[in-house]
Structure formats: structure tokens, C-alpha cells
Amino acid sequence: MTMLETLDLGRRLSRPEYDRDLLRYQVQLRELAWQLYRRKRSLVAVFEGRDAAGKGGNIRRLTEKLDPRGYEVFPIAAPEGEDQTHHYLWRFWRRLLPPDEKQIMIFDRSWYGRVLVERVEGFCTEDAWKRAYREINDFERQLVDAGAMVVKFWLQISPEEQLKRFEKRQDTAYKRWKLTPEDWRNREKWGRYDEAVEDMLLRTSTLTAPWTVVESNFKWFGRVKCLKTVVEAVSKALDYKPADPVIETQARKPGGKAGKPGKKTGGKPHA
């Protein structure tokens, strides 16, 4: 059984749990973003996943309470123009180095296109995508050596859930633009993409830049898991524990009791 097959895609949160945890981690991330600025550190967050897996929704919740001067989101599509004349990592280096005033840089799709869509669709040679695992690991190692933290998310949904989301997009006028013929064609290659994803997770999850696999059939659960993972990764890297706004609010209430928030460490790709 593969890693993706072992995921429990039924994991979910109730509305009160979602509202509570979303507030908690958004406020904590805002505090941590200020610490990144003070310490001249940066965070690189990568979101990959199936079409309609929720990358954009996760990124919106991640940035919702951040100072817009301190982050930038890079939506990545197929290379065009000058980008096509260089090594595939060139266009990403241009965005990341030299560091500017942005503490948080977020990629909606990324350099992993080389070992995902380019591999499956035959846009590069087999030698090229096999070589890319080492190139990507070296690339991310250089980012870490330059003072960045790297967090990477694979958002996993089932074929059935993806179909539901496609049909909803098709039936909703203001969402219809998101659905393309290519999205439907990609569904026919689900197994080949699964194989590429498994190889990617196995070969590019490192101690310094681990993958987090996010069960995303239920959007509320996936959003909170991503936010929590980012907060814990930055908190650990900075050795700084942000205040918990939920506990502080409870403590201010008559008879309220303040508890201690749990803490989770990073590691290899996990669910």
C-alpha cells in the first residue's frame, strides 16, 4: 500500500473547531511574521496538489491576517518567453534571491512541475526528471543555507471529491473560468500522477525541507492543518512560542482557565 493510499481522507472539523483553530493559527502566524522581520529570516511555502485540491483557498487563509507588505504569492504556470531559454530553476531563483523585504514567499505550484506534470505529460526527458530530484534537493538546501525555512504541502483529494468540485465549478458562473479541458484530461492519468507524487515525496522530503501531506477532501481540516504546520515550523526554527489568542480569551472570561497549547515537531512526509 502506498503512502497516498494510507491517508484518511475523511478527516474533518466541526464549524466551531474550524473557527477556533483558524483564528488561533492566523493570529499566531501574524506574530511570527513580525519575528521573521526582526530576525531577518524568511519562509518559503510551497503548495502542490491535484487540480481543485484547494491550493488557492489554503493560501488565502494563510495570508488573511498578514501585513501585505511582508509576503508575496507566486502563481506558477508553464514557463514562457525568456524563462524557456534557461534552466527550469532559473525563474524561481529570480523570485527568491537576492532576498528583499518579503518575509514570506508562497508558491501556488512550483519547481516540482518538473517531476510532476512535465514527467507525466512527457514535456521533458526521463533523464531530465530523474536528475531533477537531486537538483531540487540542492536548490532547497541552498535556500535553507541562506536563512530561509522551507515548508512544502501536498494537498490530496480523492477522484470522487475532485469530480464533485469540477462539477460545482462548471455549474457556478463565476468559478467556471477555473475549469479547463486540461483538467479533465489530467483525471484520465490519475494513476500516473499518483506514481509521480509518490516518487516526489519519497525522494525530495528532507530533514531541512520536509513534505507535509494534507488530507484535503474536507477543506476546513486541510486549511487548519496547513496553518498549524507553518506556525509550528516557524516557531521551532525561531525558538519562539507565540501567544495563543484562544487561551488568552478563555482566561479573561469569568472562571476561565488557561491551558497549554500542544506542540508538534517537524519531520519526514507525514499525514
Residue ranges of each PLM-predicted region?
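Glycine-rich phosphate-binding loop of ATP-dependent small-molecule kinases
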Residues: 1-271
